[in-house]
Amino acid sequence: MIHFIIALVLFGHGVAHVSGFIASVSKKDIGFHIEKPWIFSNNITLQSPLGKFFGILWLAATAGYVLAAIVLIASNDWWTTLLIPAATVSLLVIIPFWNTVPPGAKFGAFFDLFVIIVFTTSLKEYLSELV
């Protein structure tokens, strides 16, 4: 039962990344401050060419989290192999656009950090016993 709950959380977190892609390619208001620059330069926004590249990376994080959830439900042990890169990419796309992303994405960054810490330390074995 616990693996279904974890898979649902991972799936939901993954799907939430679609908003980063949408914000990079459309003017639709979905909570992002698309006019604000990223933290390194005032010339780069989420809708600049580099910002659009980051939007594609948001989709990669979506794919990683969603696939990890599916593999977990299928009871395969290698779901964490997908999860760690997905969390890393997610964190790497949120941090540069910290001024741009909505509060939910900032919370998601802390979730990504939690995932990276748990699944790259001995805590991984403890969680593996639960699922």
Residue ranges and their predicted role:
Residues 1-131:
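Membrane-interface extramembranous regions
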